A protein has these predicted regions:
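Short hydrophobic alpha-helices and adjacent helix-cap/hinge residues
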Residues: 1-329
């Protein structure tokens, strides 16, 4: 072999070696950080999001990895948990509901953040507008304040003799602006319907018994729940206490009614959380949160549980049942 050919051969082999080595290196799996306000065992919305990922072909441990963080309803822990996800250098943060979304936004302005189930994204300061978020945050909204008056009207129609309505809410979940909007909508609807309101706060499931005892003591005729991640994710416990208190209630999601609650009016929340996964998919394919509009639900379900109505000795008007999307008999 001539010296020139030998040098060319060695040079070509040396150049090809790094390419071959690189080809053999496994591709880095995208790392998703999830931030939940709830305990690990209360994960209805997270499960729906993970199913959405699987539907899109993202299988944990095969082509994606997930770092999970849970705040156990201690909302003051969320900033610390969000900062930990940032230190882990996750590729995207998925926050379930507004409080984790705010904590993630304060922790980073560069890592993409997808928030599932926001109440009022603009009012809570998470996005500049629904059409153009203009930051590193986007996601889905279930539309919070606007539906409260509708629920109160349905409750009054179902129980025409009701005069005093207990309102259960979770303090600190939303911004002062959004909470003021919810209160304004509720009080305005109550005045129109001739109802008196009894506002009761619950910081966590441990407050349920005391809150419902106050409702019974003060003679509440029915119950309205403000939308809240804590109340939604603890829906079985809420329904159980309401049933034992013999208090008819209207809720923001059908899961309550499936568990034995009286009525619900709102978006299909599991479907909304599954849709949240599509944002992650688009971001992994190069889209920026600033260019992805916040998605609003296009359909709202009205569900009535007639078994619960009978147990409470309530005669739901046939005109109301005719408008229900589903009646559980």
């Amino acid at each position: 072999m001539r010296r020139r050919d030998f040098i060319t051969l060695i040079g070509g082999a040396a150049a090809a070696w790094p390419l071959a080595a690189r080809a053999q290196q496994p591709q880095k799996m995208p790392l998703i950080g999830t931030l939940m306000p709830s305990p690990v065992e209360v994960s209805t919305s997270l499960d729906a999001f993970l199913q959405g990922l699987r539907d899109l072909g993202y299988i944990e441990g095969q082509n994606s990895a997930i770092e999970r963080r849970f705040a156990d309803w201690k909302l003051d822990r969320l900033p610390e948990l969000a900062a930990d996800l940032v230190r882990r250098n996750v590729d995207v943060i998925v926050a379930v509901s507004t409080p984790p979304g705010r904590a993630a936004q304060e922790a980073t302005r560069t890592i993409p953040i997808v928030v599932g189930g926001m109440a009022d994204p603009v009012g809570d300061g998470l996005v500049a507008s629904l059409a153009r978020p203009n930051g590193n945050v986007t996601g889905t909204t279930f539309i919070g304040p606007e539906l409260i008056a509708k629920r109160l009207g349905l409750l009054k129609e179902a129980i025409p003799g009701a005069a005093r309505i207990a309102v259960l809410w979770h303090p600190g979940v939303y911004s002062e602006y959004t909470m003021a909007q919810m209160l304004h909508e509720t009080e305005a609807a109550a005045r129109t319907l001739g109802l008196e309101l009894q506002l009761l706060a619950a910081q966590g499931p441990g407050d349920f018994d005391e809150a419902f005892a106050a409702m019974r003591r003060d003679g509440a005729d029915a119950l309205l729940l403000f939308p809240s991640p804590m109340l939604y994710l603890e829906y079985r416990r809420v329904v159980d206490v309401a049933k034992s208190s013999r208090l008819p209630a209207i809720y923001a999601a059908r899961e309550f009614v499936d568990a034995g609650g009286l009525m619900s009016y709102g978006a299909n929340l599991p479907a909304l959380f599954r849709r949240t996964a599509t944002y992650v998919d688009k971001i992994f394919k190069g889209a920026k949160p600033a260019d992805l509009p916040v998605e609003q639900p296009s359909k709202f379900e009205f569900v009535v549980n007639l078994q619960t109505a009978k147990a409470l000795a309530l005669d739901i008007p046939s005109t109301l049942l005719a408008r229900a999307d589903e009646v559980i008999e």
